[in-house]
């Protein structure tokens, strides 16, 4: 399976691989766990993850999700966190122009102008940072089949 990024240029696409709406309320194996407030059915993925920063989608490691992918070129980053505060890219403040202002031509997706008929204004942009995160973990025995 090859990941496609051209959805970035289609104004009718507003989500890709998004889970359907669901409750994020905590749940417990039994009433006693609920009283203690510590669920045996929760496994935190917070911590250090493998991370690869790419300045645009064309440079991203497209197959990094595969089990046999070599992550030797990946760094480590703390999750949750912000890539900018971890030293990747530039911090974006609200009182400052966006980094692509004056660098890349950006019109709303799907609205090419007479001067610029490119269909890949976002997916083919020179500057459109992408972060690829990866973490391998073993599912605890008590969570299997749940």
Question: Predicted segment positions?
Answer:
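Extended carbohydrate-recognition surfaces in non-catalytic/accessory domains of CAZymes
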Residues: 1-145
